[in-house]
Amino acid sequence: MFVVLFVLTLILLYAVFVVWAERKVAAFIQDRLGPMEVGPYGMLQTIADLIKLLQKEDIIATGANRFLFRLAPVLIFTAIFAGFATLPFAPDLIGSKADVGVFFMITIVSLDVVGIFLAGWASNNKFSILGAFRAIAQVISYEIPLTLSILAVVLICQTLDLQEISFQQGIYFVNKQELNTSLFGITSLGIDVNKIGGFVSWNAFKYPFLLLAYVVFFIASLAECNRAPFDIPEGESELVSGFHTEYTGFRFAILFLAEYAMMLLVAFLGVVLFFGSWNTALPNIGSLHFADWTSGTPGTIAGYAWGLFWLISKGITVVFLQLVMRWTYPRLRVDQLMNLCWKILLPLSLFLVIVSGVWVVWMKI
């Protein structure tokens, strides 16, 4: 119950902050100030907008399927919220420890597209249903390279448990499976990355080809979130607002919150798989035990605090990169989007899976 309340509070506070941050990022890139009037530096603008949004009239179109129209936003948010259940927030802080956490996460990330289709179809609006069709085609296409990029990590780590993957990238890893913990998997170097800790022990640095896997993961996750430059399902110039054209008031707020929650979820997932999860970024250097000093002991208050700090810091950094991407790159056409997926990302992700398999076999020789 504590984790449920913690995640819900985290999502709400994050949404308030990131909506303001997105406006400021957009303003900076477009050489303007952004919100400045409500609160210091406009920091309370999101609260004001939320109050205004909740006062809006709840309108349901005459021809809409009222039951499914109401159900869709709840289904979308619930699917995304459930994804946080198996995320490790600290060494001993996880909603539900699952041995197949990676599989659960891949499944749950895909479920929100069902709600998107219901939202588009139940609205009985041509723009909404076209947006829903685009979202389905996009998500199904990008699900494949996304899953393959994750599979590359799973092959290396030899587990589907997200908490175990987290431990493998830090100083508290107990090597029960006799995994190769040498830098680049080369035992002759004599460098045990788990003793050094910090960024040196992260998957993306321990196995350099996984940096390329993360690039595939990041691009595919943007498409999963329907974020620019992959926001074709919501193309304002073509579809008004896509699948949520007919939504107003509180239900629109739920859809808006779900989109930002999805951004945070895939950011956290990428951090857990590639960038050390809740482990510190600072390595031990000689007598300077930065990793030890900035990790805390698992099961203690310091362990929880440091774990949350590092995971949230890394996650927010990725979200910031997502925001910059939106205001930097133009929206792709549908054919460009599909070409990128099927002709570039899919072959690249397949190649990375093969490299991971060969790497694992080579490390055991």
From Swiss-Prot:
NDH-1 shuttles electrons from NADH, via FMN and iron-sulfur (Fe-S) centers, to quinones in the respiratory chain. The immediate electron acceptor for the enzyme in this species is believed to be ubiquinone. Couples the redox reaction to proton translocation (for every two electrons transferred, four hydrogen ions are translocated across the cytoplasmic membrane), and thus conserves the redox energy in a proton gradient. This subunit may bind ubiquinone. It comes from the Bacteria. PANTHER family: NADH DEHYDROGENASE SUBUNIT 1, NADH-UBIQUINONE OXIDOREDUCTASE CHAIN 1. One of its GO terms (biological process) is aerobic respiration. The keyword Membrane applies. Keywords: Cell inner membrane, Cell membrane, Membrane, NAD, Quinone, Translocase, Transmembrane, Transmembrane helix, Ubiquinone. The chain crosses the membrane at residues 1-21, 71-91, 100-120, 136-156, 199-219, 254-274, 301-321, 342-362. Belongs to the complex I subunit 1 family. Its main location: membrane. It is a multi-pass membrane protein. This is NADH-quinone oxidoreductase subunit H 2. The keyword Oxidoreductase does not apply. NDH-1 is composed of 14 different subunits. Subunits NuoA, H, J, K, L, M, N constitute the membrane sector of the complex. Its EC number is 7.1.1.-. Pfam families: NADHdh.
